[in-house]
Amino acid sequence: MAMNTVFLHLSEEAIKRLNKLRGWRKVSRSAILREAVEQYLERQQFPVRKAKGGRQKGEVVGVDDQCKEHKE
């Protein structure tokens, strides 16, 4: 999977905590942040109005589905 670079502004406290976690887990900060973002996006679900894709009113879909619909 191709990866893109994203720049974040984090508090000094968040960086300290992230560094401790990095040392404990023996993985990079990028790996921890990538995992956290992926988990967050998985948990996010939004009600969607009836769309051309045959969804029913109020059906819940994930972020990926909404991104695809937005581009169409």
Curated annotation (Swiss-Prot):
Signal peptide start and end residues: none
GO biological process: regulation of DNA-templated transcription
Species per Swiss-Prot/TrEMBL record: Escherichia coli (strain K12)
Family as reported in the entry's similarity comment: Belongs to the YiiE family.
A GO molecular-function annotation: sequence-specific DNA binding
Region (Disordered): 51-72
Gene: yiiE
Name of the protein in question: Uncharacterized protein YiiE
